[in-house]
Amino acid sequence: MKSADIRQAFLTFFEEHGHTIVPSSSLVPANDPTLLFTNAGMVPFKDVFLGRDPRPYVRATSAQRCVRAGGKHNDLDNVGYTARHHTFFEMLGNFSFGDYFKRGAIRFAWTFLTERLGLPADKLWVTVHVSDDEAERIWKDEIGIDPARFSKLDEDNFWQMGDTGPCGPSSEIFFDHGPEVAGGPPGSPEEDGDRYIEIWNLVFMQFDRDSAGTLNPLPKPSIDTGMGLERVAAVLQGVHSNYEIDLFQNLLNAASEATGYDDTSAPSLRVIADHIRSCAFLITDDVLPSNEGRGYVLRRIIRRAIRHGHKLGAREPFFHTLVAALDAEMGAAYPELRKARPRIEKVLLKEEEQFARTLDHGMGLLTEALETLDGEVLPGETVFKLYDTYGFPFDLTADVCRERGVTLDEVGFQRELEAQRERARAASQFGADYTAALDLEGETAFTGYERLEDEARVTALVDREGNALAALEAGQHGVVVLDRTPFYGESGGQAGDTGYLEADGMRFQVTDTQKQGGHHLHHGVLVEGRLDVGASVTPRVDASLRAATMRNHSATHLLHEALRQVLGEHVQQKGSLVTAERLRFDVSHFEAMTRAQLDEVERIVNAQILANAATRIEHMTLDEAKAKGAAALFEAKYADSVRVLTIGADDFSIELCGGTHVARSGDIGCFHILSEAGVAAGVRRIEAVTGEGALAYFRDQEAKVARVAEQLKAKPEQVEARLEATLERNRTLEKELERLKAKLASATSGDMLADVREVAGVKLLAKQVEGVGGKELRGLLDQLKNKLGSGVIVLGVAGDEKVSLIAGVTDDLTARLKAGDLVKHVAEQVGGKGGGRADMAQAGGSRPQALPDALASVPSWVEARLGE
């Protein structure tokens, strides 16, 4: 049965059983800012389940278009390399809104699979939640499922919409591909194999979870089911990979023809065949390539497909030509795709043409770097050079490295990125006031709160010395002033944006953005073309860096309030620096924070991130903001109207801020404190990372633990115990070594007495000794003093570029000669100084070669002192 026939059979079956066929909704969720894309069949019915959206039906069925390529549900990296990962898929579903419940859902599913599709009952396996006795009875007593092909699972069979709200147990139906395929049944240790494949999930929404975690029965239990079209098609067509079904085979053949590559099983062709579906349908739903949000995800998918085509030998635009094959395959089922086909082809062609030069050059450089790589880790410096100098996207570099079995040095890449920003900030401090040479009216209009791409006009150009220019030529560094810009200028502790100013044949790389005299100054270099005053340009902010900066900036607000809660109300912000890589936050506090305090601050911030509360921006008078409890920098000056940011659950943090921020606290991802230290009297500095920066840090730490484990010949979880055992063994060996050295020193002291001489009637020993450490030197001195009974002793040890000295005078002689004076005399000759008590003194020096002569001078010095 073909994919199109399965889709239609599903919809027809449920229509025959009283369900209304609901057309697929947009991939852009309506009125749901929590989702990047529609990623499940129930998403369009979310408000129906919550009782907010009354519909004229209580039963519905749909074939919903879904995308998983960003945010929590992100399959992008696996697409093309596994049998069932896709950026785009179709979810077949049937829904009941307070109508039929478990019995109806189970009967419908079983009837459709075994009767309409003709699947053998003995090839199906069913699971239910461990607590769902009702569903178990229906399956066993009414459906007659073989108990040997039935299992009860825990969290795998419980679904919830969020931390609170509708939820309930589920029942999953799996298809058994047979013993010739590796893998075990659901719930077994071998369940990750490919033998048993989930094809349908029936969710029984019967509870409402409150904030305390209590499950309260819903007055009208509902049903939400989902069956992946691609998966069930693979079952019916007798193949183990979704890419082998008819729908994908036609797209793979088209991709093969477009790229000139014949092997349709190649992962790169699978990537292309998958990506044309998600890209085409996203554009159908009015998502366009950009450097922010959904548009940025779309651009990433397009460029990934282009890169895989390039890998197969395609050197001319090809991706847009696949829209025709997709239209032939899916246009009848989704007429909106057919209608949008011309627009889709134009958008894809434009992206291909824009990316062509970057890809060709970047791939050549990356290939060369990989071929000459010494080891299995691509240095962060190389990755950064590709990204910064040649505009080669980081994620594409990662994709290529993955294929070659090479690891990326992400930490090194981030370090280079931060170094560049530091250089840019430093460079921006040199020279005169750039606006002094300009005759400009008004201010640069900032549009970056709403968008990361705009259309603007160049109002002025300045070189790095502050001289006004009429134009910039390729390779020339300078500063560009625009009439409007989405680039955030460094202020309020937030680093300025980076990105590009683009026009036909012109590209200016923005390495930093500063604010001066009401204008945004875009510092950078003209990469190609010519840029004239008055020219129209498209400013495009680096979306990934802006997003990372926003995560870090929003985290500083949560951090500030968490510090006040843990340390006290006296805590005030004293400064901050927010970049894409990390955040630095200075606060007033009188002592170092304890480990427990740091852990509690980190816990509070992450709890607010997990709460995923919406961020709120408001404009009000300064007095209104103060009345609201908004925090502000004590020494800062504010306008009459201020911008107030509220972030976190229950208005956790309220502060005045003009920076850019995440839409929800959950967008920060996670938060980790790197360090806490004093930077001035009464000021503590905290450095932290969030999101990808935190993950990169954790990966780096994990890698270090793995390396230590390898050195210790232990598993990572055994490192602590093995290290403690090793340290304990070292301590034991050190004690034994000290004992042996002491024993050796004792034996040596007897031999050294032969070198004692008499000076002015006093026994004197001035000698260089070997193989003795600091502790042993003190013990040796005591032994010699005891054996001499009365006398003066100076001992010296020469090491690598250092000298250790010790002098001793027996108590009967200290009135006439001081050990401190004696050791000082010797130390001065070996490049050191020292002193001590009358009976014992120590010193050091830096000229071991002078030690013999220094010790040789002791007799005359002692004789002179005793003769006084």
Swiss-Prot record:
CDD domains: AlaRS_core. Signal peptide: none annotated. GO terms for cellular component: cytosol. PROSITE patterns: AA_TRNA_LIGASE_II_ALA (PS50860). One of its GO terms (biological process) is negative regulation of DNA-templated transcription. It catalyses: tRNA(Ala) + L-alanine + ATP = L-alanyl-tRNA(Ala) + AMP + diphosphate. Its cofactor is Zn(2+). Residues 831-851 are annotated as: Disordered. Pfam families: DHHA1, tRNA-synt_2c, tRNA_SAD. Transmembrane segments: none annotated. Zn(2+) binds at residues 553, 557, 657, 661. Its main location: cytoplasm. SUPFAM superfamilies: Class II aaRS and biotin synthetases (SSF55681), Putative anticodon-binding domain of alanyl-tRNA synthetase (AlaRS) (SSF101353), ThrRS/AlaRS common domain (SSF55186), Translation proteins (SSF50447). Binds 1 zinc ion per subunit. GO terms for molecular function: alanine-tRNA ligase activity; aminoacyl-tRNA deacylase activity; ATP binding; tRNA binding; zinc ion binding. Keywords: Aminoacyl-tRNA synthetase, ATP-binding, Cytoplasm, Ligase, Metal-binding, Nucleotide-binding, Protein biosynthesis, RNA-binding, tRNA-binding, Zinc. The keyword Zinc applies. Its EC number is 6.1.1.7. Belongs to the class-II aminoacyl-tRNA synthetase family. Catalyzes the attachment of alanine to tRNA(Ala) in a two-step reaction: alanine is first activated by ATP to form Ala-AMP and then transferred to the acceptor end of tRNA(Ala). Also edits incorrectly charged Ser-tRNA(Ala) and Gly-tRNA(Ala) via its editing domain. This is Alanine--tRNA ligase.
